[in-house]
Amino acid sequence: MLTSSIFLPSDCTAQALADFEKLVIEGGAVNPQGLAQRIRKASRLLFVWASDDQLVGVGALKHPRAGYRNKVFADARATVPADEYLVELGWVVVTKSHQGRRLSTRIVGELLPFAKNENIFATTRADERVMSFATDYGFKLNGKAYPSGHGYDLVLYLRNAARFPDAM
């Protein structure tokens, strides 16, 4: 049985924050430089544990800096302005031992109510089915794939809160 909890970063122990960071780094899609600080600035952190208290999944809602948002939207050649999407869904990582169980879908579904009235963006590798569940939650691909700088391309997904006023 899996259990999940959502916390403000300020309510997490140092060990919980370190475990979150470790799993995100193991996921391999994030620059680890400054990650601990970015985790502490997130608006919500979600943790999923297996029955043996092993951390098997994480996710977050973030309010990234305008410079980062603007770069993502420009790189993706987004068709809408970055300042309309202030919340980022990210750091959705599931351990290899628990992949294929739709745990990412659960993580996203549990986080979205904390940003139900907000437009949300997310990025993921273009070559993965990471956001295959995106349409379940109203995310739509926007713009074009762009280089990540780490040897793979990224794509931008957007969720417009106005389209789903009663979804949460």
Sequence positions of predicted segments:
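Short amphipathic alpha-helix that is part of the acyltransferase structural core
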Residues: 1-37, 45-56
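Short secondary-structure capping micro-motifs at structural edges
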Residues: 33-36, 75-78, 106
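Short hydrophobic/aromatic beta-strand element in the GNAT-like acyltransferase core
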Residues: 43-48, 58, 91, 154-156
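Conserved acyl-donor/pantetheine-binding loop and adjacent beta-alpha core of acyl/acetyltransferases
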Residues: 54-91, 148-152
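Conserved acetyl-CoA-binding loop-helix of GNAT-fold acetyltransferases
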Residues: 90-94, 99-113, 136
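Conserved GNAT acetyl-CoA-binding A-motif
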Residues: 113-126
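Conserved active-site alpha-helix within GNAT-family acetyltransferase domains
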Residues: 126-151
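C-terminal "cap" of GNAT-fold acetyltransferases
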Residues: 127, 147-168
